[in-house]
């Protein structure tokens, strides 16, 4: 009891204004923490030394022990031997394995994948090449822990539960090794902190007390919750090599701890907010390209909102620290408090990293996938804006279909005389048939890849957070969940639709050239046809303008896509679903795809997600939402995302906020699940390109994450400027 009382005293001291210098004084350390090795080298090994030891363990175990046990032993070694560090400028420890691009296990896992493929599915890679321009991959790097459960257990409870499990297979043995290693690492952190030169610093003292408490019990204070989350994240993502793709429903999770801290006098609102800033900066410093997801909001079982005072503090912190990551996702419903929605929308128009996710349309999409209303109410948002039943599902994203490449290949066949289409309807049917063929091949390849996930990615830390996996000794990222989902993504559906409309106009309506001749123009990248290219690029007959032809083409395209994918069995006891998500493949694939008849040149980016192509939506946001209303979003239940670019002059002041609310309401009513904003003028972006030193903090929404403008290549910057030039102005 005495240690708990002393811990409370120290935590109170830690949270007091006197324990920290001004937050700005801590920033230099916080910014550098996860971008260089700030650990005390006398405490252990750096990442390169750990890699050498890991490779020796792997070599010794090869052919002798199951991979899950070898991986667990490597995890244990890292926990015991990596160097760590503590700073008076930070509430959280540092570790030597800090880089996402240089994790200890990366090389070993890639080698393991190659070995598993050559053993179990040697033909899959060859077969995947038939899906030209698309990407078929081993996608395993997504996990959402059951935060509710493990916050109640703590590290000792996690260990006790796996020790008590009746499962006796190799996987459960590996989980026991990892549970022991995590708990022992917490104890090791205590000893290193106590032995450090800074041990008497108030901040380090508070950290020692919190770590001691976590070594004996579940978190009891808001600070201990944050420390637990950071440690569990680190163990899973950096040591066990599986991305933790959400910190959970953060305001709901933190609320009881924050309120207990307030009631006991351990903290004040401002002191808690200061601590949240330090927590936020852990990921601000990591600064990985796609960001660390966290979400707030939701609806309770009684229909009232989950938003609370922690939600408001989170918004204030996101606004004030202004870093691209963590990226904030917000559940939006009719019960969302107006002050919270207004604050968030105002932040979005000032370039903060927020995505708005509609509870009602997500519930409809979940229903289309066969999930219950309760599973929809409590769903986790993860990744960019994906969603799944909380603590009951895993999701892979193993395939990204390149839709414009189908157009390129059909026109090439026409050019060499292998394709004839007397009518546009014949050509569209051929496009759909080819899409179906590529999807059928893709699903077969994915089944082969995913059938052996346990052999290369035993997700040991994540599995410890899932009750059924602990009880049954199963892999949470393989087939160990209630729902094991495989979602098929697409890139460039808007570009493909615009290209179809262009083929109809050029070949079948205006009869300016034959299909074969158009194929030659595309092969030549529009050379000698600049006038036609500019006309097609400027055409209003493009997806996103509420234009009847492109609305129908998009609806038919998604119908074919969904019918070929949704509900089909995968190889993990689950199902496939189609998604409107493209991640960043809209420009990755665009770089390697030849010209398309919509005016796009070779190498230019595609449309992303369900959005229009750059510069295509010239009729304004209302027309864009009307276009979305014209499709059946249930055809792509895996995710329905819109990237909305708006001219800043159209959403100024209170009327501007109201316009944004109306836009979101209409989009959600149309079945869209997630929306994010880029609020820029072309003039501002051109000035930022010319004078980067004036815009060091300018952020743009890339896809499901924010990036700093100055970190983009000129080609990507030019694409944003092109899109901004087409935005409707007053």
Predicted features, each with a name:
Residues 9-18:
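Bacterial N-terminal signal peptides
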Residues 22-175, 198, 202-210, 217-730:
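Conserved catalytic cores of very large enzyme subunits
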Residues 173-185:
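Extended non-globular scaffold/tether segments
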Residues 183, 190, 194-197, 205-208, ...:
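Heptad-repeat amphipathic alpha-helical coiled-coil interaction surface used
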Residues 2-10:
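Sec-dependent signal peptide recognition
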Residues 158, 182, 186-189, 503:
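Amphipathic alpha-helices that form helix-helix packing interfaces
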């Amino acid at each position: 009891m005495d240690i708990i009382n002393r811990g409370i005293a120290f935590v109170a001291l830690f949270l007091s204004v006197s324990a920290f210098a001004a937050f700005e004084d801590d920033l230099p350390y916080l910014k550098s923490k996860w971008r260089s090795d700030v650990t005390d080298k006398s405490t252990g090994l750096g990442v390169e030394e750990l890699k050498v030891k890991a490779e020796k363990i792997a070599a010794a175990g090869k052919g002798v022990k199951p991979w899950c046990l070898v991986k667990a032993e490597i995890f244990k070694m890292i926990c015991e031997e990596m160097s760590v560090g503590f700073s008076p400028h930070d509430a959280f420890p540092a570790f030597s394995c800090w880089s996402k691009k240089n994790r200890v296990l990366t090389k070993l896992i890639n080698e393991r994948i190659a070995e598993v493929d050559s053993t179990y599915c040697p033909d899959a890679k060859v077969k995947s090449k038939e899906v030209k321009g698309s990407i078929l991959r081993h996608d395993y790097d997504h996990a959402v822990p059951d935060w509710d459960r493990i916050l109640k257990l703590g590290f000792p409870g996690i260990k006790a539960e796996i020790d008590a499990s009746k499962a006796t297979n190799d996987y459960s043995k590996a989980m026991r090794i990892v549970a022991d290693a995590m708990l022992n690492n917490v104890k090791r952190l205590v000893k290193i902190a106590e032995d450090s030169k800074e041990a008497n610093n108030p901040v380090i003292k508070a950290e020692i007390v919190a770590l001691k408490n976590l070594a004996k019990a579940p978190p009891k204070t808001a600070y201990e919750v944050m420390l637990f989350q950071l440690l569990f994240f680190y163990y899973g993502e950096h040591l066990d090599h599986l991305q933790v793709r959400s910190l959970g429903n953060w305001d709901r999770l933190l609320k009881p701890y924050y309120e207990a801290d307030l009631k006991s006098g351990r903290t004040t609102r401002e002191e808690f907010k200061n601590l949240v800033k330090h927590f936020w900066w852990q990921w601000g410093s990591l600064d990985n390209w796609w960001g660390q997801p966290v979400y707030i909001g939701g609806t309770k079982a009684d229909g009232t909102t989950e938003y609370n005072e922690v939600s408001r503090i989170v918004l204030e912190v996101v606004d004030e620290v202004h870093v691209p990551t963590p990226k904030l996702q917000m559940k939006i419903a009719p019960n969302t408090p107006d002050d919270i929605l207004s604050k968030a929308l105002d932040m979005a128009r000032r370039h903060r990293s927020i995505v708005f996710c509609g509870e009602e349309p997500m519930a409809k999409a979940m229903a289309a996938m066969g999930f219950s209303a309760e599973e929809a109410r409590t769903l986790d948002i993860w990744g960019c804006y994906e969603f799944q039943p909380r603590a009951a599902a895993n999701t892979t994203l193993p395939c990204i279909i390149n839709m414009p490449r189908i157009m390129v290949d059909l026109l090439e066949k026409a050019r060499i005389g292998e394709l004839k289409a007397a009518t546009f309807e014949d050509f569209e049917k051929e496009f759909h048939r080819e899409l179906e063929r590529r999807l059928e091949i893709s699903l077969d390849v994915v089944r082969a890849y995913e059938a052996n996930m346990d052999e290369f990615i035993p997700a040991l830390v994540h599995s410890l957070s899932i009750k059924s996996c602990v009880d049954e000794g199963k892999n949470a990222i393989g087939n160990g969940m209630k729902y094991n989902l495989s979602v098929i993504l697409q890139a460039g559906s808007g570009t493909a639709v615009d290209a179809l409309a262009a083929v109809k106009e050029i070949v079948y309506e205006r009869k300016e050239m034959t299909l074969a001749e158009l194929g030659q123009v595309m092969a030549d990248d529009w050379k000698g046809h600049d006038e036609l290219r500019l006309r097609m690029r400027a055409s209003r007959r493009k997806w996103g303008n509420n234009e009847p032809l492109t609305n129908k083409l998009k609806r038919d395209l998604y119908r074919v896509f969904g019918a070929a994918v949704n509900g089909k069995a995968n190889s993990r006891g689950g199902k496939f679903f189609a998604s409107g998500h493209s991640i960043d493949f809209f420009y990755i694939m665009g770089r390697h795809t030849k010209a398309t008849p919509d005016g796009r040149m070779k190498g230019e980016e595609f449309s992303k997600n369900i959005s229009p192509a750059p510069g295509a939506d010239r009729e304004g946001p209302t027309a864009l939402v009307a276009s979305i209303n014209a499709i059946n979003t249930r055809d792509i239940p895996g995710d329905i995302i819109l990237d909305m670019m708006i001219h800043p002059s159209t959403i100024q002041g209170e009327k501007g906020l109201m316009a944004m609310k109306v836009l979101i309401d209409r989009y959600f009513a149309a079945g869209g699940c997630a929306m994010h904003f880029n609020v820029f003028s072309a003039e501002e972006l051109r000035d930022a390109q010319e004078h980067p030193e004036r815009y060091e903090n300018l952020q743009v929404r890339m896809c499901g994450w924010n990036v700093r403008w100055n970190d983009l290549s000129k080609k990507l910057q030019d694409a944003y400027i092109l899109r901004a030039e087409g935005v409707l102005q007053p």
